[in-house]
């Protein structure tokens, strides 16, 4: 009989996310007896997660053991899979700092977790902690596979494979499969009938093909129907995530201009480009329904909901949840059993996309089986899509170089190359903004930045 894997969860205080991932795990026959090692630096949140996970396990008829740890290396000992999901500095103080300091300098943001000054600062405070996980994995579980859910995904993934190329890791996001489901809803079709091919970089991948299976078994291109639905005012569907602030206009407008649909949400995409958020251009904000300061608002709401949900889970006799769209359990099951699956992952560009820089971090379809995660070759992207992605890769390249070489100048250069920042601020203003952000974050950032 096959032994059960050990699954270590770093950042287990993220109770709701843990619930989604492990809810999927416990419904996989091969993973029902897995050893779940929960690790968090906050003992209170760790214990809360333990209560929820135990009820989740019992409700699903799973019978593995659960251990709780505040020491990372202890939790990682002999792990087969390592799930990483944390936010260094949290909503308070660090996310608030990213938004408030930028706002003082005249730069508005929506999410600030991927690119721009917010994404840059988040990378600088996060990557050293990811490197420490890689260091510990090298020592106590060198053959484990890391499933990384931490943003900024591209910069984090790149920095890890640059310094620790021997660590098996993949960056995971739900934007590819999540957006496909949204588009199916917009067109009133069953998501199960979709067939698509998607590629690019994290939060800026495009559906190169988007098709639907017809009654006779053939596939038809959905793009003409999608464009017609948008122009007729029938798409996007309102309130798709229960959030009236986010109306998804930006992505549909980009689809009209580019001919391909992008994976990440409109509120994210608006700040990856120079076109939607400009000082004194309230007309653009109104026309494209750009939700400024969306992430801080979302954090406040999520914290309130989290406390309410947590109390419900703690008081419930059993917890039954629907399957999530996250790839984690699919990957674990495929590697552990050898049953092949396909996921979309963020990996090193080793000849996968010809017209993006070799070595940059790309998001492509990956085959997963007992051999591990095997990215598939895409070839050449449409040139205008590659050009747009390159503007974001420029920032990722410079920030990754900054932290690998401990070069503060490259942090300024990364901010200078950010499309949104460059459209709003002058060079000296960008330098002043970076200086203020570094000073405001203090010890949350690596020491070399303060030398």
Q: What do these predicted regions represent?
A:
Residues 65-78:
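Short acidic low-complexity segments
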Residues 188-451:
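Long, compositionally biased stretches enriched for glycine and/or charged residues
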Residues 92-163:
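Rossmann-fold NAD(P)-binding glycine/threonine-rich loop
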């Amino acid at each position: 009989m096959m032994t059960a894997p050990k699954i270590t969860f770093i950042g287990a205080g993220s109770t709701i996310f843990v619930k989604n991932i492990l809810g999927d795990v416990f419904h996989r026959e091969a993973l029902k007896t897995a050893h779940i090692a929960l690790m968090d630096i906050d003992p209170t949140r760790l214990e809360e997660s333990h209560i929820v996970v135990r009820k989740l396990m019992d409700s699903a008829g799973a019978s593995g053991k659960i251990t709780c740890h505040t020491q990372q290396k202890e939790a990682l000992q002999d792990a087969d899979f390592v799930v990483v999901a944390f936010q260094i500095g949290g909503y308070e103080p660090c996310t608030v700092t990213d938004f408030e300091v930028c706002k003082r300098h005249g730069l508005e943001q929506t999410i600030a977790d991927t690119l721009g000054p917010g994404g840059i600062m988040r990378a600088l405070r996060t990557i050293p902690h990811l490197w420490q996980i890689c260091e510990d994995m090298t020592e106590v579980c060198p053959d484990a596979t890391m499933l990384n859910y931490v943003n900024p995904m591209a910069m984090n993934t790149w920095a890890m494979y640059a310094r620790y190329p021997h660590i098996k890791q993949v960056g995971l996001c739900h934007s590819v499969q999540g957006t496909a489901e949204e588009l199916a809803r917009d067109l009133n079709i069953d998501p199960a009938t979709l067939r698509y091919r998607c590629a690019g970089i994290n939060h800026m991948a495009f559906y190169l093909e988007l098709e639907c299976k017809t009654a006779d078994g053939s596939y038809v291109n959905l793009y003409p129907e999608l464009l017609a639905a948008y122009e007729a005012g029938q798409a996007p569907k309102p309130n798709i995530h229960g959030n009236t602030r986010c109306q998804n206009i930006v992505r549909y407008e980009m689809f009209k201009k580019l001919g391909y649909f992008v994976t990440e949400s409109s509120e994210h995409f608006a700040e990856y480009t120079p076109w939607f958020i400009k000082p004194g251009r309230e007309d653009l904000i109104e026309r494209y329904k750009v939700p400024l300061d969306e992430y801080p608002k979302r954090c406040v709401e999520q914290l309130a909901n989290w406390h309410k949900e947590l109390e419900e889970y703690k008081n419930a006799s059993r917890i039954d949840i629907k399957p999530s769209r996250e790839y984690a359990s699919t990957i674990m099951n495929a590697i552990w059993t050898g049953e092949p699956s396909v996921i979309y992952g963020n990996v090193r560009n080793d000849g996968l996309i010809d017209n993006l820089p070799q070595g940059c971090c790309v998001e492509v379809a990956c085959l997963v089986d007992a051999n591990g995660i095997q990215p598939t070759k895409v070839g050449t992207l449409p040139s205008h899509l590659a050009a747009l992605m390159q503007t974001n890769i420029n920032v990722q390249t410079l920030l990754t170089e900054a932290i690998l070489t401990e070069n503060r100048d490259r942090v300024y250069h990364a901010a200078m190359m950010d499309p949104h920042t460059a459209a709003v601020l002058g060079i000296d203003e960008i330098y002043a903004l970076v200086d203020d952000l570094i000073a405001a974050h203090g010890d949350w950032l690596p020491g070399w930045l303060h030398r």
